[in-house]
Amino acid sequence: MDFGVLPPEINSGRMYAGPGSGPMLAAAAAWDGLATELQSTAADYGSVISVLTGVWSGQSSGTMAAAAAPYVAWMSATAALAREAAAQASAAAAAYEAAFAATVPPPVVAANRAELAVLAATNIFGQNTGAIAAAEARYAEMWAQDAAAMYGYAGSSSVATQVTPFAAPPPTTNAAGLATQGVAVAQAVGASAGNARSLVSEVLEFLATAGTNYNKTVASLMNAVTGVPYASSVYNSMLGLGFAESKMVLPANDTVISTIFGMVQFQKFFNPVTPFNPDLIPKSALGAGLGLRSAISSGLGSTAPAISAGASQAGSVGGMSVPPSWAAATPAIRTVAAVFSSTGLQAVPAAAISEGSLLSQMALASVAGGALGGAAARATGGFLGGGRVTAVKKSLKDSDLPDKLRRVVAHMMEKPESVQHWHTDEDGLDDLLAELKKKPGIHAVHMAGGNKAEIAPTISESG
């Protein structure tokens, strides 16, 4: 810009119209502070790198130092440039101050112009010509002074504004690192998913073949853990023994339970502490068993003619009718099945279990009475069927072989399941007896109802 063509009003007005040197001084202080901070940071970085490279050596340490060193150098260089910029700003502020001081103040220029106007207005006769020339001369000096100040300021400011350009910081990371990291992450995720699928497949395959490969897996594990090549063989042998013993647990348990139950019942039934005493049988209980006989007799007496044959004269052994001497030879205590097969309907409620034995004295009295009552019921069977009852046929005498008979009865008591039962009528009785004489064992013959009721020999033994 050609400041010489501009009047002092403009040049002086511009210099006085601006903010002054304050902003330039503030910029210089800011640049100076930035330079100080950059220099301190660079020193800290350099110290840290020196410490790391001293205690950490290797390729990674060298790579780190190589990546950080350019950045430290850049910070140091930038600090120097910032300090230079601060100095330039300070120089620019100084140039402004010098130009401002050299510039004619605008009020002085305005006063000169006002004086010139007055002189020119009062110069009627030419008397103000010298004063006017002097005022013009002072104005010209003002013009030259402002032009010189502006030219000097322009030169100084142009030098002060010439600052070395700043460089961008060097990269400390690989620009392709993000892309490479993304590719690596994708590959890792894919590999992890593949490994998970493979692991699931292996687990499922192992579970599917766990039953078949159990021995092989356990054998390998035993050999690997113990270090003994024959450990698996010992393990399999012990496992086989364990399985064999476990298979015998249930049968042995059932056998022991059955045996113990039988022993307990035997002890309760054949309790030697409280033997059976027929004298202790209550008369009321005996009457309860005989009640059925009296009821039947009373009922028959009102609706039927008198019975022409003797009844209830035979004894009872279990469910069989025998001679009276047989019943006397029978032991006092009998099996539960034999006792209850001869009881009547009224004897069952009277049989109560008492402390000390399976059947108390009262219960035995009840079933004994039922046996007698049962004889009455069997004696009237022929009459109720519409026929008549004749005299009982005695094929065996009371005095026939009492010892042998006792032995047969005792055998029946010990093994009631060995008795073979046969059912026939009067017409087939002789043939059945003839056939049974050829068969060994103990036989019980049961007579079916007919024209007459006959108690046949129900026990036979051969061999």
UniProtKB/Swiss-Prot annotation:
InterPro entries: PPE_C, PPE_dom, PPE_sf. GO terms for biological process: response to host immune response. PANTHER family: GLUTAMINE-RICH PROTEIN 2. Pfam families: PPE, PPE-SVP. Signal peptide: none annotated. Disulfide bonds: none annotated. Belongs to the mycobacterial PPE family. This is Uncharacterized PPE family protein PPE30.
